[in-house]
Amino acid sequence: MLTIEMDNFDLGQICRSGQCFRMDQIGDDRYRVIAGDKYLELTQERGIVNFFCPEEDFIFFWIRYFDLDCDYSEYINMINPRDKYLTAAGEVGSGIRILQQDLWEMIISFLISQQNNITRIKKCIENISREFGVRKQAAQVQNIMRFRLQRHWLWQRKSSFGSVIWDTEQNMCWTQPEKSVSEIFHLTVCMI
């Protein structure tokens, strides 16, 4: 577990921002995220955030994903105080981060999102992943003191073009499909 103290980072605001469909609240101030082939659990109490993942994953993946190298207070301080609308937005959404997501994932999510709500988008992602994946077990951190392998299943199918991953606990994720982009687009439209 890595503990970081930071400003302008609110897990609840990020989860509700609609940027990704695989971040879920799983308890009081506890969240889980699947991005690409990575799984992360986080807790937050005020400005203290605990990342339950290997340090290597945090350094090489999650710092970039959550844009942690960027000081968002600089942006907020640049808002013209006479702009009441933007000032209010900066105050209300001060904990939102711009997630640095996989391009393929964003494109598919965007295609699915047209004329859909979040519940339906998650279901479509689940359907695509079930169609193109195979089961894979994922490791996750259960608490601060120990790391154990939980019965947390992902589906993954490898090909020269990439892989598709789906998690049975409603944490859908994938990197890239085995099918061509046009085949996936057609199947996505059919599943919507």
What are these regions (language model features)?
Residues 1-192:
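HhH-family (HhH-GPD) DNA N-glycosylase catalytic core used in base-excision repair
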